[in-house]
């Protein structure tokens, strides 16, 4: 609806320019917001106040001319001026009801992408395969997954790329330690302890470190024995990752893995091509690109090092090769990198070097979707009691157990299998939702007590809200798609719920554009609250007439489907009862 209003305002502005009321060359960002007071309309715009000065008019006078120039629309019943010059738009409830009836008959609930479909690469998760996934991998994995789901739902062709760390000195270290300490595959499955022991040897023994580096050289040269050991490590680590992805209900598979090693053959070409473009400068033996846009505190350009003095390559080299592959081979229109906010400088440099070098042959928009850190309840980095890294699988297991105990306490009569299933859905959902509901760029503190609360903006609350809607239809023995009739909006609570339901597509487009799942979380929480008010004030099963009951059932059905679909787009499973 906001897009419709923006289009109407734009047409009015064009007319006022033609009439000489407004000067040519204006290109204002037309803002349309939800009205705070529904008695003054459903939507409001401050466009008249924005353009009053260039028009040489008082805001209210310009607002009046804008209203007169607005094209007629079946979606708008009237437009009024409020305060210093706000335009308040009142939605036509009959048109709104028709939109919701159409949404109920649509698999996509009326949501359509604002713009043409695109091919989008999502760079997400990217764990270091030398050790197990830890809590620091959670945000990239689940935020990337949610945005990928939303883009696919809106019609984009999404290519997930799990840029795992599967190359480098760390693997030489592991191979050297394995040569010293032959162990079984079962023992090797505990990668964390194996890595810790190998790292200790690497730090304490120069002879061991030299041997480890030598094994890396042999690995890079394609030595069969080293490749076999490397493949063994990689397969074990990827199997660990896959179990975690499945528990998280994340749509990542082995087919999505495109690790650092995949670009090895192109790294020398990257350096050669940068040199051919005249972009390389040798600095202390290293090959660097200097960009004037990026300077240090002393005002000197910062180097983007693509090859060390010893001939080794760096993350920037691999990332440049990945950019070229994603643009020229995958032919992506967008590439979204869900990587820690602290890597912003690195990616801004890589993107600019790629553009300068002509690596982006197919026009591709590159965006670093940075995120903040997850801290402990004390606001400090999330660690175990002894200061170690918290394994992600351990955190998720604890979440399941805590949720199971909570659900068992509330529903002791349920069978244990059902309690376990509910516990897993609630526990995993709670961890994911607590993260996704925060702004992507914000840091947040992890707190089991808050995220497992059945009140407030939490997964348990939303999961319960969905079961409440499902319960209405279970009593009637109907599904959400088995309600005839038409939606008719009379009561204020019906209209409030209907207006919010109609915004689902707009919310999804916001998430798709900005990579911000918290917007969808806020929407679902608000929707659940509006349904609760509607349910309490507008009797469904005890409606006054059959047509009123059908109308309210249809509103409830669309609410249920929207909640379920929204939670699914966040990567959360739903329950029919709790």
From Swiss-Prot:
<feature type="short sequence motif" description="'HIGH' region">
    <location>
        <begin position="127"/>
        <end position="137"/>
    </location>
</feature>
<dbReference type="GO" id="GO:0005737">
    <property type="term" value="C:cytoplasm"/>
</dbReference>
<dbReference type="InterPro" id="IPR036695">
    <property type="entry name" value="Arg-tRNA-synth_N_sf"/>
</dbReference>
<dbReference type="InterPro" id="IPR014729">
    <property type="entry name" value="Rossmann-like_a/b/a_fold"/>
</dbReference>
<dbReference type="InterPro" id="IPR005148">
    <property type="entry name" value="Arg-tRNA-synth_N"/>
</dbReference>
<dbReference type="GO" id="GO:0005524">
    <property type="term" value="F:ATP binding"/>
</dbReference>
<dbReference type="Pfam" id="PF05746">
    <property type="entry name" value="DALR_1"/>
</dbReference>
<keyword id="KW-0436">Ligase</keyword>
<dbReference type="InterPro" id="IPR035684">
    <property type="entry name" value="ArgRS_core"/>
</dbReference>
<dbReference type="InterPro" id="IPR001278">
    <property type="entry name" value="Arg-tRNA-ligase"/>
</dbReference>
<dbReference type="Pfam" id="PF03485">
    <property type="entry name" value="Arg_tRNA_synt_N"/>
</dbReference>
<keyword id="KW-0030">Aminoacyl-tRNA synthetase</keyword>
<dbReference type="InterPro" id="IPR009080">
    <property type="entry name" value="tRNAsynth_Ia_anticodon-bd"/>
</dbReference>
<protein>
    <recommendedName>
        <fullName>Arginine--tRNA ligase</fullName>
        <ecNumber>6.1.1.19</ecNumber>
    </recommendedName>
</protein>
<comment type="similarity">
    <text>Belongs to the class-I aminoacyl-tRNA synthetase family.</text>
</comment>
<keyword id="KW-0547">Nucleotide-binding</keyword>
<dbReference type="GO" id="GO:0006420">
    <property type="term" value="P:arginyl-tRNA aminoacylation"/>
</dbReference>
<keyword id="KW-0648">Protein biosynthesis</keyword>
<keyword id="KW-0067">ATP-binding</keyword>
<dbReference type="InterPro" id="IPR001412">
    <property type="entry name" value="aa-tRNA-synth_I_CS"/>
</dbReference>
<keyword id="KW-0963">Cytoplasm</keyword>
<comment type="subunit">
    <text>Monomer.</text>
</comment>
<dbReference type="Pfam" id="PF00750">
    <property type="entry name" value="tRNA-synt_1d"/>
</dbReference>
<dbReference type="GO" id="GO:0004814">
    <property type="term" value="F:arginine-tRNA ligase activity"/>
</dbReference>
<dbReference type="InterPro" id="IPR008909">
    <property type="entry name" value="DALR_anticod-bd"/>
</dbReference>
């Amino acid at each position: 609806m906001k897009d419709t209003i923006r289009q109407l305002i734009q047409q009015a502005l064009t007319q006022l320019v033609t009439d000489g009321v407004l000067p040519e060359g204006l290109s204002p960002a037309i803002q349309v917001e939800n009205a705070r007071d529904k008695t003054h309309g459903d939507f409001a715009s401050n466009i008249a106040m924005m353009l009053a000065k260039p028009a040489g008019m008082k805001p209210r006078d310009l607002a009046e001319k804008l209203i007169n120039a607005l094209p007629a629309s079946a979606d708008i019943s009237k437009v009024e001026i409020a305060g210093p010059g706000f335009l308040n738009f009142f939605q036509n409830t009959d048109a709104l009801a028709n939109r919701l009836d159409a949404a109920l008959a649509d698999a996509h609930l009326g949501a359509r992408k604002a713009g043409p479909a695109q091919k989008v690469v999502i760079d997400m998760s990217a764990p270091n395969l030398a050790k197990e996934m830890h809590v620091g991998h959670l945000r990239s994995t689940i935020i990337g997954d949610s945005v990928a789901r939303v883009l696919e739902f809106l019609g984009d062709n999404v290519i997930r790329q799990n840029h795992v760390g599967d190359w480098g000195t760390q693997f030489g270290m592991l191979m050297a330690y394995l040569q010293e300490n032959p162990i079984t595959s079962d023992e090797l499955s505990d990668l964390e302890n194996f890595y810790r022991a190998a790292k200790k040897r690497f730090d304490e023994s120069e002879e061991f470190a030299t041997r480890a580096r030598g094994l890396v050289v042999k690995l890079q040269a394609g030595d069969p024995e080293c490749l076999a050991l490397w493949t063994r490590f990689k397969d074990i680590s990827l199997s660990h990752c896959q179990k975690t992805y499945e528990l998280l209900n994340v749509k990542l598979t082995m087919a999505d893995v495109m690790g650092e090693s995949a670009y090895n053959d192109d790294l020398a070409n990257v350096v050669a091509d940068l040199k051919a473009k005249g972009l390389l400068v040798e600095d202390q033996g290293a090959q660097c690109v200097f960009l004037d846009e990026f300077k240090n505190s002393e005002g000197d350009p910062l180097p983007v090092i693509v090859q060390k003095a010893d001939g080794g390559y760096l993350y920037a080299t691999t990332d440049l090769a990945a950019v070229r592959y994603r643009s020229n081979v995958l032919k992506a229109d967008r590439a979204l990198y869900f990587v820690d906010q602290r890597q912003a400088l690195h990616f801004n440099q890589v993107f600019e070097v790629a553009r300068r070098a002509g690596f982006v042959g197919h026009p591709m928009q590159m965006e670093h979707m940075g995120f903040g850190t997850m801290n402990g309840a004390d606001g400090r980095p999330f660690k175990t009691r002894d200061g170690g890294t918290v394994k992600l699988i351990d955190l998720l297991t604890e979440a399941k157990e805590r949720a199971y105990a909570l659900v068992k306490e509330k529903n002791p009569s349920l069978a244990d299998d059902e309690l376990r299933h509910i516990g897993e859905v609630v526990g995993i959902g709670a961890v994911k939702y607590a993260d996704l509901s925060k702004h992507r760029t914000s840091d947040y503190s992890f707190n089991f007590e808050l995220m497992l609360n059945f009140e407030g903006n939490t997964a348990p609350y939303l999961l319960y809200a969905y079961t409440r809607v499902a319960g209405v239809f279970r009593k009637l023995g109907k599904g959400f798609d088995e309600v005839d009739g038409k939606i008719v909006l009379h009561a204020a609570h019906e209209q409030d719920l209907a207006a919010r339901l109609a915004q689902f597509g707009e919310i999804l487009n916001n998430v798709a554009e900005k990579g911000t799942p918290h917007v969808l979380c806020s929407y679902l929480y608000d929707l659940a609250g509006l349904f609760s008010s509607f349910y309490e004030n507008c009797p469904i099963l005890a409606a006054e007439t059959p047509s009123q009951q059908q109308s309210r059932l249809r509103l409830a059905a669309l609410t249920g489907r929207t909640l379920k679909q929204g939670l699914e787009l966040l990567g959360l499973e739903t329950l029919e009862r709790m």
